[in-house]
Amino acid sequence: MTEHKSGFVSIIGRPNVGKSTFVNRVIGHKIAIMSDKAQTTRNKIQGVMTRDDAQIIFIDTPGIHKPKHKLGDYMMKVAKNTLSEIDAIMFMVNANEEIGRGDEYIIEMLKNVKTPVFLVLNKIDLVHPDELMPKIEEYQSYMDFTEIVPISALEGLNVDHFIDVLKTYLPEGPKYYPDDQISDHPEQFVVGEIIREKILHLTSEEIPHAIGVNVDRMVKESEDRVHIEATIYVERGSQKGIVIGKGGKKLKEVGKRARRDIEMLLGSKVYLELWVKVQRDWRNKVNFIRQIGYVEDQD
């Protein structure tokens, strides 16, 4: 009988290297928020990938960066704590970018862990094959990685091969989650993240990190209809105007795009109501951050 592998794998890397894209690719559902703006992942989003011979729980950590506020402190704490809780580490980098100080900072952290560390060079669809080997050799000069695998999370290139390699390093173990469970976050959290993703796609650079979303109410009204009420929090009145848009057009578009994805997630029709409120300097208010679900209760 074939042995069954199971384990927890942390995905770590600088902001915007494609960690969320990878999680969504291997899970087959949108679990982690995707945006072209850095530092958009705020919690350890666990995506559960179940195959006949293995179950891998991916922990998509917030991108490593120097904290600028209480929320940033929390994001960094989550990223570092994750390294001590898992069976393998994916260090993801952009194959089409130079090694930066952020990468060097992470490598120094990784040198001190006993867990297997896989270097995953993402976005190989954006580089010429001749440029790949020199990049790999450059990373090898920093530390000895357990394995080095180039992939494109967006295009799906080499992703299955990486999963096969990863499985060989995981311990034998049971399924921790049922076959049909794809995340350990409650549905309300994922719904809030979908709404936040749409706002990030539709607003300008000044908005992203000032956005928080709380799902106030989520009720199944019938077999095929769910009623959701959510509040979008910003830090300034001017940001509220940007999110709402002229004549409410921007907010309507956010709702339209979010509703489409939420209906796919829940498998039923969704009636979505959105409000925008100003909560000044909310990213520095620990109690408020906890209230909207971005901080786990910790001792």
Curated annotation (Swiss-Prot):
Keyword Transmembrane helix among record annotations: no
InterPro entries cross-referenced by the UniProt entry: G_ERA_dom, GTP-bd, GTPase_Era-like, KH_dom-like_a/b, KH_dom_type_2, KH_sf_prok-type, P-loop_NTPase, Small_GTP-bd
Function in brief: An essential GTPase that binds both GDP and GTP, with rapid nucleotide exchange. Plays a role in 16S rRNA processing and 30S ribosomal subunit biogenesis and possibly also in cell cycle regulation and energy metabolism.
Organism: Staphylococcus aureus (strain NCTC 8325 / PS 47)
Pfam families from the UniProt entry: KH_2, MMR_HSR1
Designated name of the protein: GTPase Era
Region (G4): 122-125
Domain called Era-type G: residue spans: 5-172
